[in-house]
């Protein structure tokens, strides 16, 4: 059972953070909120999303699972104006999700959860370097890096966080000392990542006041942030191998 009311923009932002990587997901419904974990088809990136019950204006649920087509859900949510509320009601017998926006009511057919790719096991990584920066600053750096290359290096040396992108002709480098960051745990780190993935992720990251980056040497990058109203998002992105 699920009955809930939530701000349309809050739900749209949460869904966008996931739909940049996958089209279909299995939501786990709990009394504490909605959760999901998913991996992209190429097994390069993972995403974890948790929408706390406190993010909803009204939330009543019993434990269960539902499979959702995020493309269709996003399309329906695009009908809601800023400031509008979205009403959600699970029709268990019909295996549908009723979505209400203003005077409109839609029914979204659900997917059998067993038909959706199994949730990934998110590895527990003890990455040495932690950096916290404004989401908008990270988004701007990623957009700038895209202009010169299709990959970017993220690293930490001493008290400096840096991002480097090199193309055939042009190059870009961002450096920020610990005093310019929101927070920092120094540690030797340097890894190369695909800008295709980071660009998709950064659309949601740019809306967060603060984003935490956890980096190692040729290790996956963990990106954690919170969108408004208690929506928790975490990405894990596999590194690329640097060519000598």
From Swiss-Prot:
PROSITE patterns: PCNA_1 (PS01251). One of its GO terms (biological process) is leading strand elongation. One of its GO terms (molecular function) is DNA polymerase processivity factor activity. Signal peptide: none annotated. It comes from the Archaea. InterPro entries: DNA_clamp_sf, Pr_cel_nuc_antig, Pr_cel_nuc_antig_C, Pr_cel_nuc_antig_CS, Pr_cel_nuc_antig_N. Keywords: DNA replication, DNA-binding. Belongs to the PCNA family. Homotrimer. The subunits circularize to form a toroid; DNA passes through its center. Replication factor C (RFC) is required to load the toroid on the DNA. Sliding clamp subunit that acts as a moving platform for DNA processing. Responsible for tethering the catalytic subunit of DNA polymerase and other proteins to DNA during high-speed replication. HAMAP family: DNApol_clamp_arch. This is DNA polymerase sliding clamp. It comes from Methanothrix thermoacetophila (strain DSM 6194 / JCM 14653 / NBRC 101360 / PT) (Methanosaeta thermophila).
């Amino acid at each position: 059972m699920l009955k809930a009311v939530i701000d349309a923009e809050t739900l749209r932002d949460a869904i966008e953070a996931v739909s940049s990587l996958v089209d279909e997901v299995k939501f786990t419904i709990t009394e504490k909120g909605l959760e999901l974990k998913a991996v992209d088809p190429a097994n390069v990136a993972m995403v974890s999303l948790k929408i706390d019950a406190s993010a909803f204006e009204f939330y009543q649920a019993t434990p269960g699972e539902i499979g959702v087509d995020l493309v269709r859900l996003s399309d329906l949510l695009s009908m809601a104006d800023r400031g509008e509320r979205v009403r959600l009601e699970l029709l268990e017998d019909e295996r549908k999700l009723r979505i209400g926006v203003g005077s409109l009511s839609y029914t979204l057919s659900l997917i059998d959860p067993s038909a959706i790719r199994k949730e990934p096991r998110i590895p527990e990584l003890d990455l040495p370097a932690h950096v916290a920066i404004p989401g908008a600053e990270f988004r701007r750096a990623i957009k700038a890096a895209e202009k010169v290359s299709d990959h970017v290096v993220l690293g930490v040396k001493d008290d400096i966080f840096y991002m480097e992108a090199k193309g055939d002709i042009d190059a870009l480098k961002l450096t920020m000392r610990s005093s310019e960051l929101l927070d920092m745990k120094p540690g030797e780190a340097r890894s190369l990542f695909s800008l295709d993935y980071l660009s998709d992720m950064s659309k949601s990251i740019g809306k967060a006041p603060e984003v935490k980056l956890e980096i190692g040497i040729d290790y996956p990058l963990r990106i954690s942030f919170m969108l408004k109203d208690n929506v928790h998002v975490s990405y894990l992105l596999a590194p690329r191998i640097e060519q000598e």
